[in-house]
């Protein structure tokens, strides 16, 4: 750790000593907006002729050029669906000009109807459902992980079980796990979360992260319920290379790189990228179930390799044809908490090939096609063959089975679970004039599983895992209406769910096995509306009845510690959200945003992971009611200081009248649901400036974040002395400094500055104070 501190100090000294000429340089800062409603245009291109240099507008339409000499510059600003505009900008020595560039939307004739093109920023901000957008400016170059960024988002928490590579579950307004959709470029990844974690996506490749709360757009496909996270990747310049290396506490190392090339004359874009992560995760943890003794994690090594490529053609019959091969390889030791696990580990590999086809005016005028197909082969290997297990005092005990085993019930395992998956998502959008849009979405999932565990069969004396076939289809139809003056927007969606499964199952400790043949369907509907009271003030109201299909693991278990539960029913959620948004982004220097939302949810057939005396199982828990409120304010306090603050109160209560499958009154009715935080808050400040040490082409960011989670219960609050997960307050500090007009970045971060004790769900200890430093180079 001392070496890490010395490294950070050396980098800070390097930044201070790296100064160029002391001449007073000029700069340009501005925003690009739609000329009719002042909405910022995310991703608009700004090109300075004299510099032969360009930039892309950020999430608020902002852009900046620094370190300029006095003189006159020509800025060419363009955006898809808008007329290109040229601006002459004259700078005096030492002057930073602030400008607003308004682009006029193009119009396309569809017969007798005129359809005005809409930019991506307008589509996002004008949606009727609650959505938080995290821009590339909050991501690029920093030591932050995606988890760090999402944890600061109002209404969102990340439930981690340990350090780097530990299981991470996203929670939105208290709903978590497979209820929350995980998407990359609107492609569902929930079926592959055993192989691709939300933190695996190289953060420097991300343009923005969209967090949907409550109603999830049907165009995403799948059966997400209660919320979704969609990661949108960057669009790169014609020539681009990006490489970074980060070193963090607990012997953690991260390497990420991407290379892109655009051959415009042939309409071909290709690239490769990837990342490698290694960590020992050897932090000291405090075991609350053993009188708070402190032990160093000794079996939590983690390695992951992620490689990907892309070939995109823009001059074939389709507007865009893309092929993307991906490989993900993971190795993870299994760290013990209740006992000292020393040998068990997991290896997994995933091979994925994805194809995307896009075509505007497909077959008929006004009909846009977007179809993606992916084929995946995955191999998941759990090895647990230790002949004895240990307690935390170092005492050894023989395994239950002569074949070994130290996990769960301590029966040996050498599982090889292979799966072949095909996913297809079809999105058809038809524009009917300026005010009406119809969208049809179809999402097919085919999964054939081939598990094998000869060691387990020898250990327990029977076959426990079987081949399976699972098919599901979700169809969605959405009708959008937008008033002529753009004050009112309504989005009505209906969904149909169908799933089938064919396999066999056997109780872990019972005799015999049986056929499992499921064929079920369901229906959901939701509506969301938005009304502009003033150009800067809008109200949102949404309500929905959504359904989530049980996953394969929930239905079939894992043949080891999780028993089958093929009788599981789909979850059903009734939700209402009402909110207000006051937004001055791009209209006032403060870029002030104030948002408040109230929400209600009633979840039926809640699927819950429950541990028993022998093994565990997913069960339909019954009913749960949620009432909550969230609020956020963020603004540029000055031209060099940005601040934000948010708070979430989410009251999740057991709503069952009776114990499951009985007439016995439920003793926990009305009690708060355990293991779910109910009061959270975040706040932060960011100082940013140009050429703080003189010279030119340098930018500096220094930030501080504080997060608070109130104490909550480990189990239902039945007695005053029950175990609780304690209140936690953590502070993070960090910096980022860039050189040569954002070509070289050096950043550092201290997480959990005060070394506060932090426990996650089920009292799992999380890392204390840690350090990280990162260097990144961009060639464009």
Locations of the language-model features?
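Short, acidic, small-residue-rich periplasmic hinge/interaction motif at the N-terminus
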Residues: 33, 37, 44-49, 78-82, ...
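Face-selective signature of the C-terminal outer-membrane beta-barrel domain
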Residues: 314-329, 348-510, 514-526, 530-538, ...
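Membrane-embedded beta-barrel scaffold of Gram-negative outer-membrane proteins
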Residues: 532, 540-544, 570-627, 648, ...
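Periplasmic-side early beta-strands and strand-to-turn transitions of outer-membrane beta-barrels
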Residues: 238, 246, 263-344
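N-terminal periplasmic accessory domains that precede
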Residues: 97-102, 146-149, 166-171, 183, ...
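Short acidic/polar hinge/loop motifs at secondary-structure boundaries
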Residues: 66-67, 187-213
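Extracytoplasmic beta-strand/coil segments of soluble accessory domains associated
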Residues: 131, 147-188
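Gram-negative outer-membrane beta-barrel transporters
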Residues: 593, 598-602, 620-713
